[in-house]
Amino acid sequence: MKMREEDMEVSTESASLRVDRRSGELSLYGAAGMLLTRQNRPPRCGCGTPAGPGGTDTAAGASDDGFETQFALAAEERIYGLGDQLDTPLMKRGCKIAICFRNGKEVHAPVPLLLSSQGWGLLMDTDRRHEFDVGCSSPDVVRIRGGRGELAFYLFAGGGLAELLQKYTELTGPAAVLPVWAYGLSFNCNQQATARDMLEDALKFRREGIPCDMIGLEPTWMDRQFDYDGLVDWHPDRFYIPQWLPKGAHTFMGALRMAGFKLTLGLYLRDDGEAGKQRDLPENWYEYLKPFVAQGVLGFNLCTPIPIREMANAPVAADDRSEDAESLPHSTVVSRSIREGFATQTGLRPMIYTPVGYTGIQKYAAVWSGGRSRAHLSVLGLGLSGIPHMAVDMELHTAAGIHCGFFQPWAKVNSWAYWRHPLLLDPELLLLFKTYARLRYQLLPYIYSAAHVAARTGLPIARAMPLVFPDDPHAVVQQNQYMFGNAFLVAAFTDQVYLPAGDWYDYWTGEKFTGPADISYRVPKHAGGPLFVRAGAIVPMWPDMEYAGQKPADRLELHVYPGGAGEFTLYEDDGITFGYSHGEIAVTSIVCRDERRVFGVELGPRVGRYPDMPESRTWEVVVHALDKPAAVKVDGKQWRETKGSFKKPPPASWSYDRKTGTLRLLVPDIVERPDSIRLEISLSGGRVVRRMSEQQRSQSRPNVGHRTSDELEKDIEVGLETGNTAKALSALELWWSVRAAEAGSVEDVREHWLAMNSLFVRTAERKGRTLHEIAGGDPLLRSRFQSNYSAEDAYNSLAQIAARIIEYGKVQGDTYGIIRQATDIIMSEIDRELSLHAIADRLHLNSSYLSRKFKQEIGLSFSDYVLEKKMRRAKELLLAGSTVAAAADQTGFKDASYFNRVFRKYWGVTPGEMRS
């Protein structure tokens, strides 16, 4: 801790916090000393909150013990998090969000977690209703206020949204890893279902060959409503069980278990209905659930007595304090009690899922909601709020709904008050549902590994684009697509897809696309929506199963997609106990490398053990989108090609399917293997992967209209100078497609390649380096472009050189980045005195150097720029009705008379005249 006259500072390895000793205002700085955020007004506690329209506090009713604080927002700052908020975008800047369940909107899990693209996060520590005004009332301020309770919050810093989620996970606790079967398909029966109806629903899945694991019952299974105060029993008519023999294979639960199903029961969350009454749970209330768990129940669905939609719109009196006492953490407390009680009773992980949640719910339960028009936004919003297990009831009667429903962290069909069952669909939709269900079960090892990543790092299974591509300005605004794990890009309820930089494969057709690109996608008949696989992806798959665990995990398919380096970590455990949290887990690292003439895959040894782990296994390696290889080696030994059925191929052999462009080989593996297994695939031609058709290539180009080569070259230059990778590579791809179409020979291709390299040379020289110093490792630069190189080789070379130039600029910290940091500081601290020397010190620069570069880039001197921004801000405030004194204070003028003189000199009128 450092104590200074004006402030005190507390520092860690990743951040430092400064407190103004006069005002109490906080400023958070990153590890490099850059300002991340600051309070631009002293916090207020215990003195009430400002009155809203009509004289009542808009956050939570008038009170004398509320709180308020606010932080400055930078000009380009993006804000994410705040839980599941219907009808709000993923990026919350410009929104006003109440952290409560009853606010006129359908809210399932309000989480008071705010994540900033500037590298800082904030978590409120309160269980009272409060409100975030994220640049809605004032565009450059985030204001947090509540009507009751004390002001308490956590501030943390990180290198990006992913690192901030990890910090949140460390702060609140890791997400639970659900039982492996919970990541399959779940089906909730109609609320009027009987035991016979439930069994019939289950057997329909088996008869039709549709994989499914979980069958759920609504709370109507009981003889009376569960109130946490006494015993309940099965409904005597609809779920009759002989009291003299309540357990065993002869019961309806036993019949379900024999067919591979797991039963979950619905419970209503407690709702006392009295304003201000605490929802205290009786001690040891889990005892009332023990008999059902002993009979084989494996999970519980925590329901609300009335649907969330109706609850949201229930009228609330102006002076009703039940809103504030609604006990936001109630479902978290109930979920924790069940999870701990169930674990003590059985040693197994339960499947607990609830429609409402709050901070910390991720440690005990999954979250679900009813049908929504844009279900994926709820899933992505909670993923950005530290809750990785969110599912929205599948929209069963549309192809797009099935597509999105199966690519959620967990998949759920909810019949509830309706008749939703896949066997009631028309034949085409039924076939589509079956296709997706089987794919989901094949992907279970991939999904389950992503769940382990979520528990360890906070990175969700369904990942919003800003989380994965934070530096791509076009990617961060995409709301109708997301990454499912690290390999799959899913587009939901749209045929417009943006592919970030790199190569991508259409999962349904096998065609290759190159990004960055905007695509108008045509969904094949056998699919429900766009699905792409990233080049370099490694995807483990199970064989076909009707339910998780039906077959031992001793044979796994490993699908690999060339086009880049990739890695994947496979996490395996027993799938049902808590052993994974005590080290009973096996971890396998798999990497692939894509060199010019050799594609390699390395299978690391399994590290760790778990009960009943197979002692040996076979990897069925499937490499996609290849031309037929010249040779295949495993651990240095050449394998021979074989033809015919791949079900029982001879040892040490491989086969190639020309129609699908896939290479297959079976690689045996044992537990005690100390070293990695290395696969080397020597490619026969000049192309690493199959080329896409001309129709697909034209679809993958960004829609930029008719551009000349000169215009595209200017775009490339701008992208290289500003470090905008997406802009540079997009323009380069278009430029090359035009030039390649004109090329009639290898010499023509070489000329175009040299022409672009001359542009690269000029760019490198402006950075004070030669092109060989920046990108001398490029094979084509070394070899001077030989005659056997193809047009695709040439384009790949140019794209790699462009990427290296941009990366070099980022590493060196170019002028553009320095000036951007300086202007960000100015705009975020416009209400303070700003000097060139102070900002230069914070950026670790010489003030003369900063002054010179500022004038070169901005066109104004530092002092003129600051004055312009202060005067424009003052004008905005005055025209909005601010007093002269307030406008002076909020633009950093401590002397109002001096402010008057400066303002009049700048605008030609006094502040008072401007205001009137």
Explain the meaning of each model-derived region.
Residues 33-528:
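Catalytic-domain carbohydrate-binding cleft regions of carbohydrate-active enzymes
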Residues 535-637, 657-693:
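Accessory, solvent-exposed terminal regions and/or long lumenal/extracellular loops of proteins
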Residues 8-14, 489-491, 598-609:
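Short, well-ordered beta-strand segments enriched in hydrophobic/aromatic residues
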Residues 823-828, 837, 856-894, 916:
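Terminal helix-turn-helix DNA-binding modules in bacterial transcription factors
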Residues 1-43, 498-501, 518:
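Beta-strand-rich N-terminal accessory domains
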Residues 497-509, 621-646:
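Solvent-exposed beta-hairpin/edge-strand motifs
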Residues 687, 692-834, 838-846, 860:
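Inter-domain helical "communication" segments and dimerization helices
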Residues 839-843, 847-848, 854, 880-915:
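Sequence-specific DNA-binding recognition helix
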